A protein has these predicted regions:
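N-terminal secretory signal peptides that target proteins for export/translocation
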Residues: 1-8
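Bacterial N-terminal signal peptides
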Residues: 9-21
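N-terminal acidic, glycine/proline-rich low-complexity segments
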Residues: 24-193
Length: 193
């Protein structure tokens, strides 16, 4: 019986050694483009991507939608800090892509009503002064990290070019950052996975 146990140990050791000798398949590279909120769908998606062993979250780009960009940047930074993740967060487009969409939103609601859902996201409250002010007021402390200095549009362009054919962009907010990136650098379109 001991002989079989010893043989089994050797066989398992050889299998583990062989598995370790081959490189693990590359992790899927992803940029998350989001109108970030605390927790809920966007925050949960970000943390799931950040902590998934099969994913390398290259960065998080923030766009106005459910929240203003300043709010989204503060929320993303704080959630990543709590999770112990050092992932770039880049501020992006803070107005709807369609001309005068923000300015005409009040009139649109008067003419057509609110529909089944009264939630209007960033359109429903004043734009914050800065992400730092949002962070301090919301969390009562100084931020431990800072957003990436690049605009989200430039972040997307540069990262796609750096990882041609390898990068997935997960859009879970308005697509304004990606739309402007494509308009600014149409060469990236075939490079996105």
């Amino acid at each position: 019986m001991r002989r079989w146990n010893r043989l089994w140990d050797v066989v398992l050791g050889v299998i583990v050694s062989l598995l370790c000798a081959f490189p693990v398949s590359a992790r899927e590279k992803v940029i998350l483009d989001s109108d970030m909120v605390e927790g809920f769908d966007d925050g949960v998606a970000m943390l799931a991507l950040a902590q998934s062993p099969g994913i390398k979250l290259i960065g998080v780009t923030i766009v106005a939608g459910n929240t203003w960009v300043s709010d989204g940047v503060a929320y993303a930074l704080r959630q990543l800090e709590i999770a112990g993740q050092n992932i770039p967060v880049a501020a992006g487009v803070d107005r709807p892509f369609r001309p005068q969409r923000y300015e005409l939103f009040g009139l649109e609601r008067q003419l057509f009503g609110m529909g089944h859902d009264a939630w209007v996201g960033a359109f429903g409250y004043p734009k914050p002064e800065s992400w730092q002010k949002v962070y301090r007021e919301r969390y009562g402390k100084e931020p431990q990290s800072r957003p990436d200095p690049r605009h989200a549009v430039d972040f997307i362009i540069e990262e796609v070019r750096k990882h041609p054919g390898e990068l997935t962009i997960a859009e879970i907010g308005p697509c304004s950052n990606l739309a402007l990136a494509v308009l600014k650098a149409p060469d990236i379109v075939p490079l996105i996975k």
